[in-house]
Amino acid sequence: MSNRKTTIGDNIRKYRKKFGISQDILSKRANLAFHTIAKIEAGSTQDPRIETVKKIADTLGVTLDDLIK
């Protein structure tokens, strides 16, 4: 599980930086709390809800698969 959480967080960070978006901007655009994005990227949150990851994917303009693989 820890590897999956890290992978999701790493992928979110990769795409966020690729598109030049800060955690703060991503959280506002996805209508999520800043700490939610920060914790997922750090891998320190319990398994992130699929709905949350989907919101992030949609906001970044990538697929859910892009973030979980």
What are these regions (language model features)?
Residues 51-66:
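DNA major-groove recognition helix of helix-turn-helix/homeodomain DNA-binding modules
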